Amino acid sequence: MGPGDFRRCRERISQGLQGLPGRAELWFPPRPACDFFGDGRSTDIQEEALAASPLLEDLRRRLTRAFQWAVQRAISRRVQEAAAAAAAREEQSWTGVEATLARLRAELVEMHFQNHQLARTLLDLNMKVQQLKKEYELEITSDSQSPKDDAANPE
């Protein structure tokens, strides 16, 4: 396989791909990779490469900046989403705490009401006991006076 065979092979490949949509602009016309016969083509390629180098460098810088910007934006978005999720969890936690406090306050009010009812019942029972004691003491004193009265009053 000689240098001419290589060139013909490249020409066939590039011509075959130019018929495909979207592929023709990706392939340049075939050029030899190196100067086999000393006809000066290799210097042309080197000059073209040097001329294209600033354009490629500019393109590389633009792509790098665009990629870095996209990465920073994605990171920023993730940080914001994480912060929003943390804030939502904290809000939900505070909502749960407030609901628990409201339930405990309601129970405390109910217990306070029951405490007042029990205190009133206890006072009522105490008054009843005091009244029963007085009645009992009166009955005992009246019973103890009755036998003396019976002895003094013979009927």
From Swiss-Prot:
For this chain's UniProt record, which GO biological process terms are given? Answer: response to testosterone
Q: Which superkingdom?
A: Eukaryota
Q: Which organism is it from?
A: Homo sapiens (Human)
InterPro entries recorded: FAM167_domain
Q: What is this protein called?
A: Alanine- and arginine-rich domain-containing protein
